[in-house]
């Protein structure tokens, strides 16, 4: 086992505080509408310029390992807040730095770190309740666009595009952000359920110009095994022909004689039909077939359920307004499944998302949820240069996450004002002893840090801004750093999602509490002599037992 270096109490805390300050000072310059740019060197390609706090935090690795411990703990605040709320990373970093700095001063003055932490936790609890109570629900498209615009650093087009995407696919739908091949930023919406399986034979194509199968009002047969012979299906196929409607077969595979027979019937005009492989593999395939069944009002033909192919009747087939199939994708639009059954299935998938610990499973469940709940929108971000596209994509990602959070828990005045106003709730709060009350005072002072930083980034004196806002009793009065005016922030469209503000404070206080109560820090000791250290006697470093 490698040797370790150990620092104790104030030595450990001072070293870690230096790391906290280095990282936080680099991140906090990006805060607010007049946030400055940070340029990051890349090992290959052009340097990257960004105003995204979490991107800056991820790039910082310090040479001094004790300082790096502090920096990494603050980086954890940024990434935790990003995971939970998708935005607010810079605010969380600024809050954490403020709480740590004040907290460590109090510890150095002889206060009990555990009581300070209890006071901090008590204050955070009160502030979070105050933020929740003052939040306003987001309902209109205009409000959604405002949230998106703020998070995209004032880019109105991005805000409007996100509002449009959410309007099209609903709050549960999936909205993805990709880099465009052109200079334009555009929105592409796929309504209905789409999965990544195309037609099994080009002979099924009905629209030769677009190379697509387009079937109006089709019946949909779902079979979970391979289909190699159509013999057992003849009774239901005859019934389909008599109904005069087209048929889509979705099965694990359709092969050999079965596929040939379907193609021949399609070419002769006896049966308008298309066959597609079922999406996914294994258990996920079963689940997705079940999703399609619920969406289209079908019954999955499965021997597990005791249903044989020869017993299939027309009422076991699903229905939809339209099915489009390309060589890569199948889209089912307006399935006729019962609304209550679809909602129950959505609830079930949401529960699975909450329970799963695997990121991969979560992503796949989220995709299934979107397919059931309304569709997929893709925002393709364009720009003149690669650097510009990457920077804009960061902002669009932030804006999208912030907008989702706003729809979930409502909005509060932006620009750090919600935190500043919430600090008034701490005016009469006292702890069980003086040290706890000092912890409450630490949070009260720290809540001013974000608005001070926003003002300073805009070139205005932070303490004057804080004083003016605290003098005014209106909960929505604040400083708009974009216009450098004092206004009603909600009316002016300067808003933050309540979830982002709340999460930023909770995560910042959690990590700051850990740093304040740290009594020892352990890192690996630097190796003496540095080289690659192979055993004596030739060979490459680290490969001394090989002969050459």
Swiss-Prot record:
<feature type="binding site">
    <location>
        <position position="496"/>
    </location>
    <ligand>
        <name>ATP</name>
    </ligand>
</feature>
<dbReference type="InterPro" id="IPR027413">
    <property type="entry name" value="GROEL-like_equatorial_sf"/>
</dbReference>
<keyword id="KW-0963">Cytoplasm</keyword>
<keyword id="KW-0547">Nucleotide-binding</keyword>
<dbReference type="GO" id="GO:0005524">
    <property type="term" value="F:ATP binding"/>
</dbReference>
<comment type="subunit">
    <text>Forms a cylinder of 14 subunits composed of two heptameric rings stacked back-to-back. Interacts with the co-chaperonin GroES.</text>
</comment>
<feature type="binding site">
    <location>
        <begin position="87"/>
        <end position="91"/>
    </location>
    <ligand>
        <name>ATP</name>
    </ligand>
</feature>
<dbReference type="GO" id="GO:0016853">
    <property type="term" value="F:isomerase activity"/>
</dbReference>
<comment type="function">
    <text>Together with its co-chaperonin GroES, plays an essential role in assisting protein folding. The GroEL-GroES system forms a nano-cage that allows encapsulation of the non-native substrate proteins and provides a physical environment optimized to promote and accelerate protein folding.</text>
</comment>
<feature type="binding site">
    <location>
        <position position="415"/>
    </location>
    <ligand>
        <name>ATP</name>
    </ligand>
</feature>
<dbReference type="GO" id="GO:0005737">
    <property type="term" value="C:cytoplasm"/>
</dbReference>
<protein>
    <recommendedName>
        <fullName>Chaperonin GroEL</fullName>
        <ecNumber>5.6.1.7</ecNumber>
    </recommendedName>
</protein>
<keyword id="KW-0413">Isomerase</keyword>
<dbReference type="GO" id="GO:0042026">
    <property type="term" value="P:protein refolding"/>
</dbReference>
<dbReference type="InterPro" id="IPR018370">
    <property type="entry name" value="Chaperonin_Cpn60_CS"/>
</dbReference>
<dbReference type="GO" id="GO:0051082">
    <property type="term" value="F:unfolded protein binding"/>
</dbReference>
<dbReference type="InterPro" id="IPR027410">
    <property type="entry name" value="TCP-1-like_intermed_sf"/>
</dbReference>
<keyword id="KW-0067">ATP-binding</keyword>
<dbReference type="InterPro" id="IPR027409">
    <property type="entry name" value="GroEL-like_apical_dom_sf"/>
</dbReference>
<feature type="compositionally biased region" description="Gly residues">
    <location>
        <begin position="528"/>
        <end position="548"/>
    </location>
</feature>
<dbReference type="InterPro" id="IPR002423">
    <property type="entry name" value="Cpn60/GroEL/TCP-1"/>
</dbReference>
<dbReference type="Pfam" id="PF00118">
    <property type="entry name" value="Cpn60_TCP1"/>
</dbReference>
<feature type="binding site">
    <location>
        <position position="51"/>
    </location>
    <ligand>
        <name>ATP</name>
    </ligand>
</feature>
<feature type="binding site">
    <location>
        <begin position="30"/>
        <end position="33"/>
    </location>
    <ligand>
        <name>ATP</name>
    </ligand>
</feature>
<dbReference type="InterPro" id="IPR001844">
    <property type="entry name" value="Cpn60/GroEL"/>
</dbReference>
<dbReference type="GO" id="GO:0140662">
    <property type="term" value="F:ATP-dependent protein folding chaperone"/>
</dbReference>
<comment type="similarity">
    <text>Belongs to the chaperonin (HSP60) family.</text>
</comment>
<keyword id="KW-0143">Chaperone</keyword>
<feature type="region of interest" description="Disordered">
    <location>
        <begin position="527"/>
        <end position="548"/>
    </location>
</feature>
């Amino acid at each position: 086992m490698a040797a370790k270096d150990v620092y104790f109490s104030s030595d450990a805390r001072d070293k870690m505080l230096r790391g906290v300050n280095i990282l936080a000072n680099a991140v906090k310059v990006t805060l607010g509408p007049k946030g400055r740019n940070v340029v990051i060197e890349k090992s290959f390609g052009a340097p990257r310029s960004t105003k995204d706090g979490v991107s800056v935090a991820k790039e910082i690795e310090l040479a001094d390992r004790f300082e790096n411990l502090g920096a990494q703990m603050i980086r954890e605040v940024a990434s935790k807040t990003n995971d939970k709320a998708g935005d607010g990373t810079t605010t969380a970093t600024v809050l954490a730095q403020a709480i740590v700095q004040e907290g460590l001063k109090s510890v150095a003055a002889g206060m009990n770190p555990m009581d300070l932490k209890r006071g901090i936790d008590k204050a955070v609890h009160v502030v979070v309740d105050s933020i929740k109570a003052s939040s306003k629900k987001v309902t209109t498209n205009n409000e959604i666009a405002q949230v998106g615009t703020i998070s995209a650093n004032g880019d109105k087009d991005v805000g409007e595009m996100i509002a449009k995407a959410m309007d099209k696919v609903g709050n549960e739908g999936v909205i993805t952000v990709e880099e465009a091949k052109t200079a334009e930023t555009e929105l592409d919406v796929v309504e209905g359920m789409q999965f990544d399986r195309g037609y099994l034979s080009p002979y099924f194509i009905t629209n030769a110009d677009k190379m697509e199968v387009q079937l109006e009002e089709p019946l949909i047969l779902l079979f979970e095994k391979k289909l190699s012979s159509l013999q057992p299906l003849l009774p239901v196929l005859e019934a389909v022909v008599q109904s005069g409607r087209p048929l889509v077969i979705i099965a694990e595979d359709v092969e050999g004689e079965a596929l040939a027979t379907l193609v021949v019937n399609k070419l002769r005009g006896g049966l308008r039909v298309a066959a597609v492989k079922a999406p996914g593999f294994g258990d996920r395939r079963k689940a997705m077939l079940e999703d399609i069944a619920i969406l289209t009002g079908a019954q999955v033909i499965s021997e597990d359920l005791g249903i044989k192919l020869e017993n299939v009747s027309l009422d076991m087939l699903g229905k939809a307004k339209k099915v489009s199939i390309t060589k890569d994708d199948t889209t089912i639009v307006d399935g006729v499944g019962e609304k209550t059954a679809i909602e129950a299935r959505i609830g079930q998938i949401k529960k699975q998302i909450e329970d799963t610990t695997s990121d991969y499973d979560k992503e796949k469940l989220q995709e299934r949820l979107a397919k059931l709940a309304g569709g997929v929108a893709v925002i393709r971000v364009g720009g003149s240069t690669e650097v510009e596209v990457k920077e804009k994509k960061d902002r669009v990602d932030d804006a999208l996450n912030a907008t989702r959070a706003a729809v979930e828990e409502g909005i509060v005045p932006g620009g750090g004002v919600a935190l500043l106003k919430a600090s008034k709730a701490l005016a009469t709060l006292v702890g069980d002893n003086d040290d706890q009350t000092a912890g409450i005072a630490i949070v009260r002072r720290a809540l001013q840090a974000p608005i001070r930083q926003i003002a300073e980034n805009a070139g205005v004196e932070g303490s004057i801004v804080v004083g003016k806002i605290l003098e005014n009793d209106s909960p929505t009065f604040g400083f708009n750093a974009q216009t450098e005016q004092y206004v009603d922030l909600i009316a002016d469209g300067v808003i933050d999602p309540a979830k982002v503000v709340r999460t930023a404070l909770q995560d910042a206080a959690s990590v700051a509490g850990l740093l304040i109560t740290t009594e020892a820090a352990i890192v690996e000791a630097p190796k003496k002599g540095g080289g690659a250290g192979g055993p004596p006697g030739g060979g490459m470093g680290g490969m001394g037992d090989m002969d050459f």
